[in-house]
Amino acid sequence: MRKFLIVLLLPLLVLAQEKMLYKEKIEGIPYEDVKILLKTALDGKNMNVLAVQDVSQKPRMTVFYVCNLSYGEKILRTFPEFGALAPCRIYILEKEDGSVEVGYINIPNLVKGFRKYLTPQAQEVFLQADKDIKEAIKEVKGGF
């Protein structure tokens, strides 16, 4: 058990030293529209939205629990402990100025922390998932 906890906590130390979250500020799009657009963009990237949790009303915050099942299967096959961190969580937060922040854990830094436990193929899968999520968020912003 102790070894398992150490395996899970070491990456957090790496994350604490570097940028822990990837965030994008979205302006000019209402909060509820961002939620709909993000769900649609994630679906387009084959990132299944497994659950949506409205965390608070003031400020409004929602968490999407997302997973690409084929990515998850490839990673869990070689690193079953990853199940403690799955699925990916993407938050949507309404800021005081009316903008909306969308973010999630910085996956490249997560890969750095777990590198010795991941095969090169699993690392590639993580980085592809990161690319897919970033592209979905940028699509919400209006970029392609």
From Swiss-Prot:
SUPFAM superfamilies: TT1751-like
Keywords: Signal
PANTHER family: SLR5037 PROTEIN
Signal peptide boundaries: 1-16
Alphabetical list of InterPro entries matching this protein: DUF302, TT1751-like_sf, UCP021774
Gene3D superfamilies: TT1751-like domain
Keyword Signal among UniProt keywords: yes
Taxonomic source organism: Aquifex aeolicus (strain VF5)
Name of this chain's protein: Uncharacterized protein aq_1800
